[in-house]
UniProtKB/Swiss-Prot annotation:
It catalyses: 4 Fe(II)-[cytochrome c] + O2 + 8 H(+)(in) = 4 Fe(III)-[cytochrome c] + 2 H2O + 4 H(+)(out). Coiled coil: none annotated. Residues 49-62 are mitochondrial matrix. It comes from Albinaria caerulea (Land snail). The chain crosses the membrane at residues 27-48, 63-82. Component of the cytochrome c oxidase, the last enzyme in the mitochondrial electron transport chain which drives oxidative phosphorylation. The respiratory chain contains 3 multisubunit complexes succinate dehydrogenase (complex II, CII), ubiquinol-cytochrome c oxidoreductase (cytochrome b-c1 complex, complex III, CIII) and cytochrome c oxidase (complex IV, CIV), that cooperate to transfer electrons derived from NADH and succinate to molecular oxygen, creating an electrochemical gradient over the inner membrane that drives transmembrane transport and the ATP synthase. It comes from the Eukaryota. This is Cytochrome c oxidase subunit 2. Residues 1-26, 83-224 are mitochondrial intermembrane.
Length: 224
């Protein structure tokens, strides 16, 4: 999860989030190169006292500043399209976890595993135990097996919410009367935190999302 003074993305816990981090680094490298080039040209322009009034065209220069930006855009677009395709395909055939947004808590069910609907409320600050995280702990968190695909289906019982789990690379709207679907694949066991990412009313900040990834054998025992 995020820590104090963090300047980068959260540590990835799923393949798709790892791909997102690589794409972020790829895009940042291009942006830093553009920034450096423009800065050097700006400094050169500021300190250059020479000028020419006889040159009316420079076809080579015009060709370069047309082709180079087009090349950079293609270099940025190709991995972006690949990542977009992976996001759409991830977890579509996995175990179904249904998340229903309410003001201001989440309820979950796993129909394919015979886990009926249960509510997940934030634990008040005065009830936290040592080591718990403020505004992130819940009284009843969904369990999922790590190493298997999970297909999250979201909807809402009232207003628009957003179910987000940053370390898994998941964020999607929960809209009343509509089912949205997105998948993730937990690489490691652990507890993963998120929050509602759509302003949904007075207690929007008190609507955490906590998912625990456990071993497949333990998950089967829990379901039985």
């Amino acid at each position: 999860m995020s820590t104090w003074g963090q300047i980068n993305l959260m540590d990835p816990a799923s393949p798709i989030q790892m791909e997102m981090m690589l794409f972020h680094d790829h895009a940042m490298a291009i942006l830093i190169g553009i920034f450096t080039l423009v800065s050097l040209l700006g400094v050169k322009l500021c300190f250059n006292t020479l000028s020419t009034r006889t040159m009316h065209e420079a076809q080579l220069l015009e060709t370069l500043w047309t082709i180079l930006p087009a090349f950079l855009l293609v270099w940025l677009a190709l991995p972006s399209l690949r990542l977009l395709y992976l996001l759409d395909e991830q977890g579509s055939e996995g175990i179904i976890l249904k998340a229903i947004g309410h003001q201001w808590y989440w309820s979950y069910e796993m129909p394919s595993m015979n886990i009926s609907n249960f509510d997940s409320y934030m634990i008040p600050e005065e009830d936290l135990k040592p080591g718990d995280y403020r505004l992130l702990e819940v009284d009843n968190r969904p369990m999922v097996p790590y190493g298997l695909d999970i297909n999250v289906i979201t909807t809402s019982a009232d207003v628009i919410h957003a179910w987000a789990l940053p370390s898994m690379g998941v964020k999607m709207d929960a809209v009343p009367g509509r089912l949205n679907s997105m998948g993730f694949h937990a690489n490691l066991p652990g507890i993963y935190y998120g929050q509602c990412s759509e302003i949904c009313g007075a207690n929007h900040s008190f609507m955490p999302i906590t998912v625990e990834a456990i071993d497949v054998k333990d998950f089967i025992k829990m379901c039985n």
